[in-house]
Amino acid sequence: DGALDHFADVPCPSGSGPRHMEFNEAVDRLYCICELSGEVLVYDVPTFSLLQRIQADEVNAGGSADVHLHPSGQYLYTSHRLDNDGISIFKTLADGTLEKIGYARTGRHPRNFMITPDGKLLLVACMNDNLVQVFRIEADGALTLTPSVLRFENDRPSCLTL
């Protein structure tokens, strides 16, 4: 009938500012990027008990924005804006917790990004630069900026989706 039923509450630390979440079905984990604290919260599913708090925003700018899991499930990426704009890179461990393995600088104000279904590219909407940057995802999860770029005249791209 299209109705939604309440399943559970996901407890988030006070002042963290939960923004977006991503499921990892392979290991029954939920990842939450927190805009204000700059953390990724890792939860067990279906209990929603908090397993890990790991810092993603390197400078505590209070502008963490988006989170996406690589199609392989091996890497998690988060975007950060307002200062030291970029993408944090995490390796997903066997138990679904995270290990931070890198950071890739982007254009200004990367509010949103997407990973192509084949897992080869990561596209970032750099709102304050009026462009979309294209990164190649390497075998080790690292990001390499490609020469490909989409430029816009005063359109301030803020969301990408397929």
PLM segments and residue spans:
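C-terminal structural cap/anchor segments
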Residues: 65, 69-109
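Internal helix-turn-beta structural module
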Residues: 121-156
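Structural signal for beta-propeller blades
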Residues: 38-40, 84-87, 130-132
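A short beta-strand motif characteristic of beta-propeller blades
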Residues: 5-12, 49-58, 99-105, 146-151
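Beta-rich, blade/repeat-based domains predominating
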Residues: 12-29, 57-73, 104-121, 150-162
